[in-house]
């Protein structure tokens, strides 16, 4: 049940993000989101380790600190830059369908970078998912492809799966030494430290607070409390209970919830190209996920917004 709710929360981040950047600049929204999340995550980390009578793990040496910083740079700073800036230009529906390509891109980069096995069934799933993303980005129009008149938000959103794939790959080495909750807390902390000066350069660090309406604040709190804190905690609890491969199957619910919530809350319509592309993406990712993961316990890369 927690995993289903986690996918619901992550699907909701596309709606919350779209609403929030409609009221305040992207870097401000991201900085506020992770400032709130960092405080809550570190409070949770301190409480859990104190309850067990243990000290909170601290990176030892330059390599481990660099590893933690790289998680904040890729999974928090870069991801949220392209995610929220992309949502300023494109629909929450398109965003949720494009980001759903994430697991397949992670598998490809893992094969190239970490020399992990990439099975033929994964290659088939990759082709289907790529085709689906292409249909969504081009709106099913050959004319768009020929003229290269793509929506800039869709192109930016393509960077989100790449940033998250890098985060997942870099995180494998970090997770070998640190508990997932601790690694996530460090990533959020470093990401916040990067986002705050970016928001200041954006000129929104102080003015952004006054731009948010009640609904804007609700959106930011959804991103921080549900999409980040509850989402990550419950995700890793699900991985520990079911194993990485079984938990990964639930990820396919994220775009479905994203599209549904975009329609219900933002009144976004789903056209034929989005429906066809979305089916191809979800089906392709599903094939690749089921065919490419061994049924083992351990940490798995999540898909978030």
Q: What residue ranges belong to the model's regions?
A:
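Transmembrane alpha-helices of multi-pass small-molecule transport proteins
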Residues: 23-78, 103-105, 162-170, 184-204, ...
């Amino acid at each position: 049940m927690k995993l289903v709710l986690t996918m619901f929360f992550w699907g909701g981040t596309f709606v919350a993000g779209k609403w929030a950047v409609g009221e305040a600049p992207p870097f401000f929204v991201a900085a506020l989101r992770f400032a709130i999340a960092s405080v809550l995550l570190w409070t949770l980390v301190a409480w859990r380790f104190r309850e067990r009578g243990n000290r909170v793990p601290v990176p030892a040496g330059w390599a481990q600190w660099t590893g933690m910083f790289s998680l904040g740079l890729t999974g928090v700073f870069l991801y949220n830059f392209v995610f929220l800036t992309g949502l300023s230009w494109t629909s929450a529906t398109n965003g949720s369908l494009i980001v759903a390509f994430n697991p397949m891109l992670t598998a490809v980069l893992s094969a190239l970078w970490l020399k992990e096995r990439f099975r033929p069934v994964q290659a088939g799933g990759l082709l289907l998912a790529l085709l689906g993303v292409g249909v969504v980005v081009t709106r099913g129009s050959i004319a768009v492809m020929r003229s290269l008149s793509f929506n800039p938000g869709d192109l930016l959103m393509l960077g989100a799966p790449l940033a998250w794939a890098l985060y997942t790959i870099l995180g494998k080495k970090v997770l070998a030494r640190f508990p997932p909750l601790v690694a996530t807390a460090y990533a959020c902390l470093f990401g916040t430290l990067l986002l705050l000066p970016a928001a200041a350069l954006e000129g929104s660090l102080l003015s952004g607070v006054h731009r948010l309406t009640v609904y804007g604040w609700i959106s930011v709190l959804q991103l921080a409390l549900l999409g980040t804190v509850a989402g990550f905690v419950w995700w890793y609890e699900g991985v520990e209970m079911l194993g990485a491969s079984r938990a990964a199957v639930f990820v396919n619910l994220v775009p479905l919830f994203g599209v549904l919530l975009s329609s219900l809350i933002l009144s976004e319509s789903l056209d034929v190209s989005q429906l066809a592309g979305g089916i191809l993406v979800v089906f392709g990712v599903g094939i690749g996920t089921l065919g490419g993961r061994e049924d083992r316990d351990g940490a798995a890369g999540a898909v978030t917004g």
